[in-house]
């Protein structure tokens, strides 16, 4: 009796499924890295806007705006981000959930300089910007 075997064996199908799984995993990792980088760049852009807002605030009020009135670092949260939007960014909605970062501002011991801190919501990445607009990562391995 002559039987024609058409189709794929179970092993061939398993190999194809395994290859598709590997490709999907690589794609998901690349995509989430892309999204993370985009959010970090958005935070950097908003920090530059805050710096411009600080310049305008200084020219109008004779001092910088601080979400943390004491010297030392601040802890970014929703309240500090909303306060920055109200006082420095013209009530814009620049610091939103899609950006994935919260911001705050604090002063140094001389009260003549400011720093902007951006912290990733639910993450470890912390960006720091000084009054000259230089942005650095607090711990590069976390970003």
Ranges and model annotations:
Residues 1-31:
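N-terminal single-pass transmembrane signal-anchor helix
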Residues 4, 31, 38, 55, ...:
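Surface-exposed loop/turn and secondary-structure junction residues enriched for glycine/proline
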Residues 9-13, 19, 51, 87-88, ...:
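Acidic/proline-rich low-complexity IDRs
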Residues 21, 28-47:
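Aliphatic-rich helix starts adjacent to a transmembrane/signal segment
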Residues 34, 46-62:
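N-terminal alpha-helical signal peptides/signal-anchor transmembrane segments
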Residues 59-143:
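Periplasmic/extracellular, small/polar-rich flexible segments of pilin-like filament-forming proteins
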């Amino acid at each position: 009796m002559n039987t024609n075997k058409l189709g794929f064996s179970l092993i061939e199908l398993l190999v194809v499924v395994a290859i598709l799984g590997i490709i999907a995993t690589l794609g998901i990792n690349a995509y989430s890295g892309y999204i993370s980088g985009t959010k970090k760049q958005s935070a950097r852009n908003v920090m530059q806007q805050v710096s411009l807002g600080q310049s305008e605030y200084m020219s109008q009020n004779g001092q910088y705006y601080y979400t943390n009135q004491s010297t030392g670092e601040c802890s970014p949260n929703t309240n500090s981000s909303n306060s920055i939007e109200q006082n420095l960014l013209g009530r814009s909605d620049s610091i939103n959930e899609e950006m994935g970062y919260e911001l705050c501002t604090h002063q140094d011991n001389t009260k003549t300089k400011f720093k902007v801190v951006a912290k990733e919501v639910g993450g470890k990445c912390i960006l720091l910007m000084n009054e000259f607009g230089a942005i650095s990562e607090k711990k590069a391995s976390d970003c």
